[in-house]
Amino acid sequence: MSDIRTVAFVTGASRGAGQGIAHALGQHGCTVYVTGRTLNPGDHALGGTIGATATQVTAAGGEGIAVQCDHSSPDDVRAFFARVMAEQGRIDILVNNAAAVYDELSLPGGFWERPLKLGDMIDVGIRSSFDASWYAAQAMVAQNDGLIVFTSGAGAEHYVFSPAYGAHKAAMDKMAFDMGLEFDHAGKNVAAVSIWMGAVMTERLRLVIASDPVKFGALEAGSEEPEFTGHLAWALYTDPQRAARNGATCIGAELAREYGITCAGGRAPPSYRDSHGVVPRAFSRLAPVRAG
């Protein structure tokens, strides 16, 4: 049995879904680079640090490596990937999870009535995911193996929170499709997949439920554990038929049924298809069109 660890990279892993995804990959024995900006617990109202996440990864059986990285900074991102390649020589799994999420997303009113900073999700969310994928793809194409995962959600197809939020989720799905198409046409064993997460039981959601248990308490029963999508990413990476998913947008709850993955106690989170009748968009697989 090989003692070489799978090298994974999870962006936005100080807390929330990113922290859980990194923890899950640690349970599968991966070397997990966790990035984010939070070094000290008091630096963010919701707590969590990249160091704490890395410690959890190692305690779970993997190797956690915390790297402070501002994904809005091209220099930070470039330096980070250079470090990973110098230390590991490969990148096997990339999970694009970093996004600029603010509490004001849930405020009432039109987008013009809320802070302009909500548009930061276009930079740390859309652009940051493209940049990270660009660097990771260099390694994956060269080694002819790899998986790029985008964390997305039903906001790609129906209104949730704000136009910037919806644009971010829709972009995750379309980038996965288009990148997957280019990997296919290049004949490479690299897959790009977008996963619709459900209501993830993050620190933020716990605060929402605690603020009004009568109104929001039902969210817990249908929620996903933060580790849930991490287990899905591992199942995809190790699936011999991974190529069949390349370019796809998958509802995480449905993917879990296929792989036999559940939350604690065997609980299966509901699918958006069943609960809301919402499904991912079917993109056209026309041959790539390029000038020249």
Predicted regions and their residues:
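Canonical Rossmann dinucleotide-binding motif of NAD(H)/NADP(H)-dependent dehydrogenases/reductases
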Residues: S2-L39
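Active-site loop of short-chain dehydrogenase/reductase
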Residues: R5-T6, G62-E63, R90-I91, M140-A154, ...
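The beta1-alpha1 cofactor-binding region of Rossmann-like NAD(H)/NADP(H)-dependent oxidoreductases
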Residues: G48, Q68-F80
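Rossmann-fold cofactor-recognition segment
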Residues: V57-S73
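A short, exposed helix-loop element centered on a Lys and neighboring polar residues
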Residues: S133-W134, F177
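C-terminal helical subdomain
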Residues: V190, S194, P213-G292
